Amino acid sequence: MNCFQEKQFLRENLLKMPFRMVLTGGSGSGKTIYLLSLFSTLVKKYKHIFLFTPVYNPDYDGYIWPNHINFVSSQESLEYNLIRTKSNIEKCITVAQNHKKSAHFLLIFDDVGDKLSKCNTLIEFLNFGRHLNTSIILLCQTYRHVPILGRANITHFCSFNISISDAENMLRSMPVKGKRKDILNMLNMIQTVRSNNRLAIIIEDSVFCEGELRICTDTADKDVIEQKLNIDILVNQYSHMKKNLNTILESTKTKLCNSDQSSSSKNVSS
């Protein structure tokens, strides 16, 4: 008998300790929009959020300060930017400690592809980032892009309508509570019964699951889906660009407006 239960994912649990999360699913599966839904929770603790991505993605406008976005089009640029970021994190932690405060950091890697598996600094972050108060989120289309040497330290595996074989391969290294066969059966059952293409199915490691045999589910927030800006998300993050907040928000609103008009035009013409 399968003893696993389906439960609503408690986002606040991500604030308890550093985590390493993988969001896996095909293009358009809802990975990014779900990640953005987590921001209102994450910014309560993580004041320094950095994005690494090969190309500009307008979805992040209004969520991450522009000077914290790193465009990494090659293996070398990813390694270089991560080394610089690590150095800045270490300096920031030293300053915070001198003032008897703590600083927490979040690194997000979106669609970086196979460059992830070859990045030594990323593997260091996955294995030892918790000692630098740093959490990691990887958005991948396939589990193959998750570095093999870092899979044993993944704390949250979020799947978006992926194949059971992909889930099985990912879970081989991840430390989980209970039998992996039961987890996969429950995962398959949820995907079959709850045919929501944007449903996030979250498997936690043996620490974050709080001793329970559970698989969590969650969905993106309505406000995020409707592209409603939440100013507090940027305000709660640290950046030297805060003085330019109004300009950044106006630019974001204009882009969203143009995007809506473009979508409306396409609908009319079709």
From Swiss-Prot:
Keywords: ATP-binding, Nucleotide-binding. GO terms for molecular function: ATP binding. SUPFAM superfamilies: P-loop containing nucleoside triphosphate hydrolases. Gene3D superfamilies: P-loop containing nucleotide triphosphate hydrolases. ATP binds at residues 25-32. Interacts with protein OPG137. Participates in viral DNA packaging and virion morphogenesis. Belongs to the orthopoxvirus OPG160 protein family. This is DNA packaging protein OPG160. The lineage of its organism: Viruses, Varidnaviria, Bamfordvirae, Nucleocytoviricota, Pokkesviricetes.
